UniProtKB/Swiss-Prot annotation:
GO terms for biological process: actomyosin structure organization; mitotic actomyosin contractile ring contraction; mitotic cytokinesis. Binds to myosin II chains myo2 and myo3. Residues 45-80, 114-149 form the EF-hand domain. Ca(2+) binds at residues 58, 60, 62, 64, 69. This chain binds calcium. Keywords: Calcium, Cytoplasm, Metal-binding, Motor protein, Myosin, Phosphoprotein, Repeat. It is found in: Cytoplasm. This is Myosin regulatory light chain 1. GO terms for cellular component: cytoplasm; cytosol; medial cortical node; mitotic actomyosin contractile ring; mitotic actomyosin contractile ring, distal actin filament layer; myosin II complex; nucleus. The keyword Nucleus does not apply. It holds the Pfam family EF-hand_7. Residues 1-29 are annotated as: Disordered. The modification Phosphoserine is found at residue 36. It comes from Schizosaccharomyces pombe (strain 972 / ATCC 24843).
Length: 184
């Protein structure tokens, strides 16, 4: 029906010798899945943005980008463009990079960005004294008038557990939803 090196869809299988044990095959397949796991966690909008970035970096249109291209891109995205960061990216892939390898590498990098730090930074804009506390009136106003506005019942249910003496303890709130600073 089809050769032993093709699956039912006609795709080539990984070449294994007759001496390869089933545990070696499972380990090889697991390693392949793990490397694409970061890519699988990207949202469709992130994938689209990264495809556009890849196209911008691929100046000659050959479907590949090199180390300098990656450094330029990271710098333009305000990401870590140090030699260590770039070397880390290239530990598992060798330049030049095709689109699939680029998406996997960038997915891995984006997964390391801490949502905890992003949340703390957002809340700190309302914290004039950088004390980890925001006046409850400020939080009520922000949650009911900015972005995706919340109704008063939603605001109170969010603030209730993290409010004491008229202040919202946003660091405790962030710890609850994004993990404590000790877990990062």
């Amino acid at each position: 029906m089809f050769s032993s090196k093709e699956n039912s869809l006609g795709a080539k299988r990984a070449p294994f010798s007759s001496n390869t044990t089933s545990s070696q095959r499972v380990a090889a397949q697991a390693a392949k899945r793990a490397s694409s796991g970061a890519f699988a966690q990207l949202t469709s909008s992130q994938i689209q943005e990264l495809k556009e970035a890849f196209a911008l970096l691929d100046k000659d249109g050959d479907g590949n980008i090199g180390r300098e291209d990656v450094k330029t891109m990271l710098t333009s995205l305000n990401q870590d463009a140090s030699e260590d960061s770039i070397n880390h990216m290239f530990e598992s892939i060798n330049p030049p990079i095709n689109l699939a390898a680029f998406l996997t590498a960038m997915g891995s990098m984006l997964c390391r960005i801490s949502p905890r730090n992003d949340l703390l930074e957002a809340f700190s804009t309302f914290d004039d004294t950088q004390s980890g506390k925001i006046p409850i009136s400020t939080m009520r106003d922000a949650l009911s008038s900015m972005g995706d506005r919340m109704d008063p019942q939603e605001v109170e249910s969010i603030l209730r557990s993290y409010t004491s003496h008229g202040v919202f303890y946003y660091e405790k709130f962030v710890d609850a939803i994004a993990g404590s600073k000790d877990s990062n």
